[in-house]
Swiss-Prot record:
Keywords annotated in UniProt: Endoplasmic reticulum, Membrane, Transmembrane, Transmembrane helix
Native organism taxonomy: Eukaryota, Metazoa, Chordata, Craniata, Vertebrata
Keyword Cytoplasm: no
Gene: TRIQK
Transmembrane segments: 51-71
UniProt-recorded name of the protein: Triple QxxK/R motif-containing protein
PANTHER family hit by this protein: TRIPLE QXXK/R MOTIF-CONTAINING PROTEIN, TRIPLE QXXK_R MOTIF-CONTAINING PROTEIN
One annotated Gene Ontology cellular component of this protein: endoplasmic reticulum membrane
Length: 86
């Protein structure tokens, strides 16, 4: 019986360490949460490079369409035909 009772009693040093650990965890919990949120926001944020690449691709596409229609719709004037001949 003596052994069973002795095992359940914790040393005051162990109780003190446990209490200090709980207090430390309570102090660092908001800091850890803020750090996690900051890392997640940084991970999911769109960078300037990606935005620049998308804008450059759209601009290149628009210029290609413009060049295609400009070259397609311009009429070639033959120098052999004189329009002033009536």
């Amino acid at each position: 019986m003596g052994r069973k009772d002795a095992a359940t009693i914790k040393l005051p040093v162990d109780q003190y360490r446990k209490q200090i650990g709980k207090q430390d965890y309570k102090k660092t919990k908001p800091i850890l949460r803020a750090t996690k949120l900051k890392a997640e926001a940084k991970k999911t944020a769109i960078g300037i490079k990606e935005v620049g690449l998308v804008l450059a691709a759209i601009l290149a596409l628009l210029l290609a369409f413009y060049a295609f229609f400009y070259l397609r719709l311009t009429t070639d004037v033959d120098p052999d035909l004189d329009q002033d001949e009536d």
